[in-house]
């Protein structure tokens, strides 16, 4: 019995669904479809599944979208899956439409994050209608968390039932992988030496794409003021872990200049293994404008780091104010600065947040729980469609 999982770009299959595809392949024949590149090859080798490369544009591109749609349709007709299950917006729209055209009985889409709530005018209307079209072609719809579910309801995207798997998130956290003890003292000391981190440094870390939507402009502005404060009792550093995407939602020129010129800001680019950087850091700062259910906040928590996050979907579900982190308003560098200064100066609060961080991830987002709940959902849908498992 065959299941096809799709995403717009291969990094989503490679990172967001790491391990899950291999788990599912123990019960089904699993095929992964995304943009064809070395990351998709890595998915195939690591997960032990067949992969097929199809380029899908992330932005609105009608002609290229039609080409991708018919390529998917052709593959679905050839592969004959029982279930197609998509993540990410464009792959969701194209997969659901192609799946319906090809007569696939079970067409599932997981909304991992919504773009339209942060847009206005004509662009917002177009995005809303695209998601409505996606939902009309899907048989089953899964918001990644309660916040995403609420937005789908509030904007009347669909009247179909909406179900959150387990406690939310598409893949959960591998707590044996994101374990502080996995990074040795020697590894930490070597990395600190490379990055010139001293014992007196309080290290903030951000992990993600360096774009405006991730709140990087506000983060750099807030940190710049803190780092230049001559009266601070501790020195500070900010690690930026992630690619700079200049073609999509570029940073403000003054932000780019500050990143280049401030010696306390370390722009380290994309890192395949983020654990060592969590291990030498003291707190995650994640002031994103929109998310579905951000893995990085859970990963940081599993590594024992408290987080400062914006009050958005997912972030405000993972973080409980004053328990395992702090929640600040979106697009507010002043409030972000206050929160960073608070966590920097209030030792008792910081220790409380730090102690709670891993247990609060462990109790809610263990990976095996989410995988088994998804498997259970697949089997339920097959039974409802009178398909023998």
Positions of PLM-derived features:
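Aromatic "clamp/platform" in nucleotide-sugar-dependent glycosyltransferases that forms part
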Residues: 270, 289
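N-terminal strand-loop element at the rim of the active site
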Residues: 5-64, 151-155, 161-164
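Conserved acidic donor-binding segment of nucleotide-sugar-dependent glycosyltransferases
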Residues: 321-322, 326-333, 342-348
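A short, well-ordered alpha-helix in the C-terminal region of glycosyltransferases
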Residues: 190-193, 335, 342, 349-364, ...
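Donor nucleotide-sugar binding/catalytic pocket of nucleotide-sugar-dependent glycosyltransferases
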Residues: 52-53, 132-186
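Short, structured helix-loop element that forms part of the nucleotide-activated donor/catalytic region
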Residues: 41-45, 229, 237-264, 349
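Short hydrophobic beta-strand element within catalytic cores of glycosyltransferases
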Residues: 306-309, 319
């Amino acid at each position: 019995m065959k299941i096809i999982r799709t995403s717009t770009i291969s990094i989503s299959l490679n990172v967001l669904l790491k391990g899950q595809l291999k788990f599912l392949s123990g019960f089904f024949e699993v095929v992964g479809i995304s943009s064809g590149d070395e990351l998709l090859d890595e998915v195939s080798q690591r997960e032990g599944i067949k992969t097929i490369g199809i380029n899908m544009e992330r932005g609105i591109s009608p002609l290229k979208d039609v080409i991708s749609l018919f390529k998917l349709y052709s593959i679905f007709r050839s592969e004959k899956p029982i279930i197609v299950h998509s993540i990410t917006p464009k792959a969701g729209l194209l997969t659901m439409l192609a799946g319906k055209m090809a007569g696939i009985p079970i067409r599932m889409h997981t909304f991992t994050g919504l773009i339209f709530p942060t847009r206005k005018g004509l662009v917002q209307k177009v995005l809303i209608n695209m998601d409505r079209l996606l939902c009309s072609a899907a048989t089953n719809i899964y918001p990644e968390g309660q916040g995403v579910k609420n937005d789908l309801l509030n904007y009347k995207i669909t009247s179909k039932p909406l179900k959150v798997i387990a406690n939310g998130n598409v893949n959960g956290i591998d707590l044996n992988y994101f374990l502080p003890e996995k990074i040795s003292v020697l590894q930490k000391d070597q990395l600190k030496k490379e990055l010139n981190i001293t014992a007196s440094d309080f290290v903030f870390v951000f992990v993600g794409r360096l774009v405006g939507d991730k709140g990087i402009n506000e983060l750099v502005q807030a940190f710049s003021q803190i780092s230049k404060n001559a009266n601070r009792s501790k020195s500070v550093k900010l690690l930026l872990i992630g690619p700079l995407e200049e073609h999509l939602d570029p940073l403000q020129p003054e932000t780019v200049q500050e990143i280049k010129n401030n010696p306390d800001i370390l722009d380290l680019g994309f890192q395949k293994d983020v654990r060592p950087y969590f291990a030498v850091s003291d707190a995650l700062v994640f002031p994103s404008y929109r998310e579905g259910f951000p893995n990085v906040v859970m990963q940081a928590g599993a590594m024992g780091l408290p987080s400062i996050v914006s009050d958005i979907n997912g972030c405000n579900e993972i973080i409980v104010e004053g328990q395992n982190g702090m929640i600040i308003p979106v697009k507010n560098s002043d409030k972000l600065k206050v929160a960073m200064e608070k966590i920097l100066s209030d030792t008792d609060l910081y220790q409380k947040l730090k102690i709670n961080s891993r247990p609060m991830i462990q109790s809610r987002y263990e990976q095996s729980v989410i995988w088994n709940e998804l498997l259970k959902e697949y089997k339920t849908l097959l039974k409802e469609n009178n398909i023998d498992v």
